Amino acid sequence: MVDTIGEARLRKSAVVADSLNRLLTEVAIRCAKEEGVRDYFYVSVLGYGGRSVQSAFSGALQGRDLTPISQVAEYPLRVDQRVKLKPDGAGGVVEVKTDFPVWVEAQANGATPMCGALNRARDLLSAWIAEHPRGFPPIVLNLTDGEANDGDPIASARQLTQLRTDDGNVLLFNLHISDKGGAPITFPADSSSLPDAYARSLFEMSSELPPHMREYAASNHYDVREGSRGFVYNSDMVSLVQFLDIGTRALALR
């Protein structure tokens, strides 16, 4: 991911890393109780590029796969200082410094071994489900900026989503990160509006949004209906953040 997103001229890899770090922070906060962070989530972040698929965690978690959220919260690589603008109560804004934990750093490695990444996720989740057969079905969020160049991702996706717990099948949601302009296509129920075979293949790979996720998406003003899939094409930065939020925050509604 060495290209940029639209007019913002930000490296796509940096945008993805920033969004993932923000998501991990928010998930950890949601799981925080008086006695500490509860392990409502196990998290794995896989980076794929060039010829490799590997854990994208850095620091103390480097090389870790599925990791309890309490350990994720405890071991960021570092904590950066960010500046946010907040209302000053008098009609203006003030700059406020805030901590920003970093677990994942931006990387750009050329090729797109998506099949390898999906197969790695399948292996990780197969082992996790064997130990947690009654758990909530795992969710895989696949963020990609290019077509797979290591095989047929539809076949790999089907093997992944055939895994199931007692509560249902693994969910696979796909988001295409674009450097082109234009409105994203979000959570479509069919492929008629998609521009090409690549977009249609990502749509076919994607799971339908469960009812509670459709409800949450609708509350965020998305046009969703029965059959809508966890798929966003030609994503911009706003859609990326909202996609990650819907893919995880909806779990709290159950």
Give the label of every model feature segment.
Residues 1-254:
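Acidic, low-complexity intrinsically disordered regions
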